[in-house]
């Protein structure tokens, strides 16, 4: 690619740098050296790094300030000139910068919000107006330079200006800057190239299909997503080569990358490095990484020059490791977005899972390598680095995160040891399979047989069943237990079942998965499938906020033991009482949590709470139609009272309110229509404004099953004009409403009102759990669940009272699970299967006592559950109800389980 050399500016900059170095040598200053000789102006018109860099040490690993230089023909107030200097200061994480055009010099300090303030201007050389004057008045500007250096040095001595360690700049700022500057233009280049190359377009489409879930809420444009992959591929290869080149001389040729090289020639350089040093997963090129605009390629060359000319070779091993970890963190944010495994969670997963640290460990969906890195670090406390690395294996179906994983798993003391890292689909792993990696000491191929593993630990991918890739579906169809799993099972369900193939008998599987299995039929079937291969040893959830803070996903940890015989074991359900951040800051608490789980004993309830069940107890509890989510909250008591409760659907018909869509048509606002009264029915649209346990439908619903022709005959112009108002409207994607709303056997504008509710409750409730009764049976819409009593249970008042007991509140919570934002995932099927206290077991005297207490409850407003259970009226009611059923001793247990479930669900918002 073409190089544009700044002749005059460059030569004068070199003179300036030489003069600064002479000043620094002759004086005892904070400023020890100047550099920047390798900066080349590119066709882009702006470079990533300053023309002159002031350093705080001779090794050039502490950067103090960047200067931007121009000749006198560029005014000192030129906006581009000023902004370039300030942009580069931000990129280098500095709080000052200086611009100089030999006529004037101006010093800026960075303030809050990345704004800059001018704090000093030097005017002594304002007689320099032309390029020729720069030579003529050399002695003048050299004298001015000494004054500038002395004054700038004073700002550093006073602490007003801060420095930036090279490691911090590289890991935190530079890679982010590369992404910001180049993502869009590389994406545009990819899009244009793909238009001319259908194979390239097909590749990016296929790649995007396989990784789209990993970019949720981060990138929606496949070309921008792949552009980030290309940027990170170049940046990490360049950085890693510069870091290892002084220990791995084969990597020294990275210094050959310059503006005269093309991307393909640079790829060839990295191929040579791989042949001599291994790290194939780091140095291999992602496909189409050469499809770079010239401006982007110049940025990568400048990045390499910056690393080469600065003091990266003088950094100690700890700093180099921090650079690697920082660049890995930046890359993870760019690649995985919100699904990157937090370091503390990775460490805990490994510690909870591994029984024998001398045995082999595998992460079958390693992503960017957080989990295997933690496994290696723990092993190294009792093993040699070589033994640790060679007993931790990792693979991922996708190649793109393996570069970061290899860097993540590499430390200074393991740089000559080949990571057991390879590309592979977790669904097709088999013991004895041949895996090829390069020996970093000899450069030759190592062919290794995949061993049986003592432990598999992984954060399994969050890929819902709707978007499981076709090749994975093919593998799934061959699985022996596929018929046990639900057809709507997410990808992690299949991986968890299939990975048993490579685990030793009595070996362990520890996985992070979505909490969706806790409250679904698919989850029940997943547990049945897993029990074919494993004992379910531990299940962990957080009672103190989501583990993945940047995602609306709530997760669980499963620890399973591969069966050696058919013996059944107890399952421990652990509810963590401390957040990941609290555990990371408190090693004693972390050890307590891990030791509690390993010993199957609750050592400290302030750290983690244990609910333990035998398999027969779990079966009995699940048969009472609660979901797995309830088992974290000590619900063994439920088995004791099963003869005193009855499913709600034995007492009531349960249905979801009418669901038609397009509320503006079906729920007209008063005063906006002339619809005839016979076509209007009272409806309750939602329960947000319901404040008491007796309610009134407060809106109108348009319920008209009469044809247009019949309406015309009847002269019902109000209904006709209302229908005509919507007949020409379209939905959000441009389809006509009559087509969108058409239903077999119905007019397109027809809303049926066949099911009238006596009692209702909410879909997906939050902090208020209640069943309200209509004064007059009414129509409900899709946001509500309606109930009408069955003839066998005619006592509507008693039924309503028992529905509103604390026990039924418990059941609502126990029948669902918390979504990512803390709302309870409950539908009409959950409610229908909930149990309530059996009305037939209530004596006449007890009935009167219950209804008397319930009248007081109906007279006041509905409260949040936590407030209800502190209220005297509520507590009196609950004690009377439980006494009527001989369950007074269960008050505290029911209350504790209910509040624990609510509190845990609420923390998902945090």
Segments the model singles out, each with a brief description of its role:
Residues 247, 277-352, 818:
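Class I S-adenosyl-L-methionine
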Residues 845-910:
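Amphipathic alpha-helical coiled-coil/heptad-repeat segments
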Residues 1-41:
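Acidic-basic catalytic patches of nuclease active cores, encompassing PD-(D/E)XK
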Residues 44-47, 78, 92, 104, ...:
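Signature of N6-adenine DNA methyltransferases within the class I
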Residues 223-251, 458-459, 554-556, 657, ...:
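P-loop NTPase catalytic cores that bind/hydrolyze ATP
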Residues 619, 626-856, 862:
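Polybasic, glycine- and aromatic-enriched phosphate-binding surface used to engage nucleic acids
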């Amino acid at each position: 690619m073409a190089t544009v050399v700044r002749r005059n500016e460059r030569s004068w900059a070199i003179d300036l740098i030489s003069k600064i170095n002479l000043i620094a040598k002759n004086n005892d200053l904070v400023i020890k050296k100047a550099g920047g000789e390798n900066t080349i102006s590119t066709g882009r018109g702006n470079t990533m790094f300053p023309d002159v860099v002031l350093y705080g040490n001779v090794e050039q690993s502490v950067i103090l300030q960047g200067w931007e230089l121009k000749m006198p023909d560029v005014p000192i107030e030129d906006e581009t000139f000023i902004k370039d200097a300030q942009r580069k200061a931000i990129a280098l994480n500095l709080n000052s910068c200086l611009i100089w055009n030999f006529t004037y010099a101006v010093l800026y300090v960075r303030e809050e919000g990345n704004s800059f303030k001018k704090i000093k201007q030097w005017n002594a050389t304002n007689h320099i107006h032309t390029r020729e004057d720069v030579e003529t008045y050399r002695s003048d500007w050299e004298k001015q330079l000494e004054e500038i250096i002395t004054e700038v040095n004073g700002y550093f001595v006073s602490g007003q200006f801060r420095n930036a360690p090279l490691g911090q700049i590289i890991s935190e700022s530079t890679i982010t800057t590369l992404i910001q500057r180049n993502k869009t233009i590389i994406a545009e280049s990819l899009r244009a190239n793909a238009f001319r190359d259908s194979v390239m377009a097909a590749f990016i489409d296929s790649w995007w299909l396989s990784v789209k879930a990993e970019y949720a809420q981060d990138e929606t444009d496949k070309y921008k997503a792949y552009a980030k992959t290309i940027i990170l591929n170049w940046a990490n290869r360049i950085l890693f080569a510069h870091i290892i080149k002084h220990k791995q001389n084969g990597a020294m040729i990275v210094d050959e990358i310059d503006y005269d090289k093309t991307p393909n020639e640079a790829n060839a350089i990295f191929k040579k490095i791989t042949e001599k040093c291994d790290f194939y997963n780091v140095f291999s090129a992602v496909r189409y990484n050469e499809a770079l605009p010239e401006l982007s390629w110049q940025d990568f060359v400048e990045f390499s020059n910056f690393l080469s000319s600065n003091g990266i070779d003088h950094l100690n091993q700890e700093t180099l490791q921090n650079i690697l970890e920082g660049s890995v963190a930046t890359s993870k944010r760019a690649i995985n977005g919100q699904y990157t495994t937090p370091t503390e969670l990775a460490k805990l997963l490994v510690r909870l899972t591994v029984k024998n640290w001398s045995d082999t460990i595998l992460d079958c969906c390693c992503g960017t390598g957080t989990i295997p890195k933690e496994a290696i670090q723990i092993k190294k406390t009792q093993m040699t680095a070589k033994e640790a690395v060679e007993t931790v294996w990792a693979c991922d179906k996708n190649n793109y995160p393996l570069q970061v994983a290899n860097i993540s798993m590499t430390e200074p003391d393991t740089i000559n040891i080949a990571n057991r890292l390879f590309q592979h689909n977790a669904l097709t792993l088999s013991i004895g399979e041949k895996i090829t990696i390069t020996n970093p000491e000899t450069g030759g191929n190592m062919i290794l047989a995949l061993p049986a593993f003592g432990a598999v630990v992984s954060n399994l991918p969050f890929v819902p069943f709707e978007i499981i890739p076709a090749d994975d579906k093919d593998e799934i169809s061959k699985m022996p237990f596929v018929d046990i799993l639900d057809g709507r099972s997410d990808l992690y369900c299949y991986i968890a079942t299939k990975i048993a193939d490579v685990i030793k008998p009595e070996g362990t599987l520890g996985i992070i998965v979505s909490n969706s299995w806790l409250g679904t039929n698919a989850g029940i079937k997943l547990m049945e499938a897993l029990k074919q291969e494993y004992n379910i040893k531990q299940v962990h959830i957080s009672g103190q906020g989501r583990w993945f803070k940047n995602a609306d996903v709530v997760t669980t940890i499963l620890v399973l033991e591969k069966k050696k015989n058919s013996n059944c074991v107890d399952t421990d359900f652990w509810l963590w009482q401390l957040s990941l951040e609290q555990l990371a800051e408190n090693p004693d608490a972390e050890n307590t949590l891990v030791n509690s789980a390993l010993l199957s004993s609750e050592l400290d309830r302030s750290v983690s709470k244990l609910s333990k069940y035998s398999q027969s107890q779990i079966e009995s509890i699940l048969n009472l139609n609660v979901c797995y989510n309830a088992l974290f909250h000590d619900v063994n008591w439920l088995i004791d009272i099963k003869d005193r409760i009855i499913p709600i659907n034995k007492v009531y018909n349960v249905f979801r309110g009418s669901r038609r869509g397009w509320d503006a048509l079906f729920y007209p606002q008063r005063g906006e229509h002339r619809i005839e009264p016979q076509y209007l029915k009272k409806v309750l649209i939602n329960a947000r404004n319901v404040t008491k346990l007796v309610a009134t439908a407060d809106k109108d619903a348009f319920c008209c099953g009469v044809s247009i022709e019949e309406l015309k005959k009847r002269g019902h112009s109000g209904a006709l004009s209302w229908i005509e108002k919507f007949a020409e409207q379209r939905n959000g994607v441009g389809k006509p409403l009559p087509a969108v709303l058409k239903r077999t056997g119905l007019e397109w504008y027809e809303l049926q009102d066949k099911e009238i509710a006596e009692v209702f409750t909410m879909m997906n409730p939050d902090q208020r759990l209640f069943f309200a009764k209509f004064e007059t049976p009414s129509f409900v819409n899709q946001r509500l669940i309606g109930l009408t009593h069955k003839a066998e249970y005619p006592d509507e008042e008693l039924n309503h009272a028992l529905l509103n007991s604390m026990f039924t509140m418990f059941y609502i919570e126990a029948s669902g699970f918390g979504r990512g934002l803390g709302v309870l995932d409950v539908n009409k099927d959950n409610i229908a299967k909930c149990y309530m206290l059996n009305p037939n077991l209530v004596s006449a005297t007890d009935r009167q006592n219950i209804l008397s207490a319930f009248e007081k409850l109906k007279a006041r407003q509905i409260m949040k559950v936590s407030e209800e259970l502190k209220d005297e009226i509520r507590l009196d009611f609950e004690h009377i109800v439980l006494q009527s059923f001989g369950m007074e001793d269960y008050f505290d247990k029911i209350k504790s389980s209910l509040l624990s479930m609510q509190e845990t669900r609420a923390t998902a918002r945090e």
